[in-house]
């Protein structure tokens, strides 16, 4: 029997891409690449933390070189101090309201007075001297300064008659005064982190903390999830992510 003849296989023709199609394909590829890039950029901008640093003078509301912000315990005051010749001077009204109401500013006589149980302390504007009863004493700095209708007293002088602690920093000028003592809530930074002006990763950074830095925990004006309001060791009040800090512990503040 004669073997069946094998039918030759038909060769498939390879489709060649028309030269006219290349520009279209390149354009489509570019559209995909640009679209992917724009999507990635959008997602990055939406979910990545801002690295913007807020200007310290703007945050503290400082308008000139000798102006100084005042953090009184856990509150940033609207009142401003003066930083002159390396010393902190508080407005006499700030002293009266927040530190010691027994100090009195006599604007008529330009005298600053303090009543001891049996004696009167008196100091004049621009003077390094002060009197206790009839005795004259001296400091190595100007105790009382005037600026228009305002008077400013050296914080070191107030400290001689009042129990409080204070610490100050420059650039920007700010002073932290502590008059409330006892047990305070604190947290510790678990890693290097940013403290922001408000609770949000897109909010400007006030300052940065390192691993192990301690911060005071402050009451929040409203309940905010995942963030804690803190006062940093360098005098900034802001917000830090909860996942970046330890659990709350207690510390004692002594005079």
What annotation goes with each model-predicted range?
Residues 1-2:
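DE-rich, low-complexity intrinsically disordered acidic tracts
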Residues 5-194, 199-221, 243-255:
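Primary recognition of N-terminal secretory signal peptides and signal-anchoring hydrophobic helices
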Residues 114, 212, 227-232, 240:
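SH3/SH3-like beta-barrel fold
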Residues 118, 233-235:
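Glycine-centered tight beta-turn/hairpin loop motif at sheet-sheet or coil-to-beta transitions
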Residues 207, 219, 228-230, 237-240:
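Conserved glycine-centered beta-strand/turn positions repeated across beta-sheet architectures
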Residues 232-233, 255:
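Long, low-complexity, Ser/Thr/Pro- and Asp/Glu-rich intrinsically disordered
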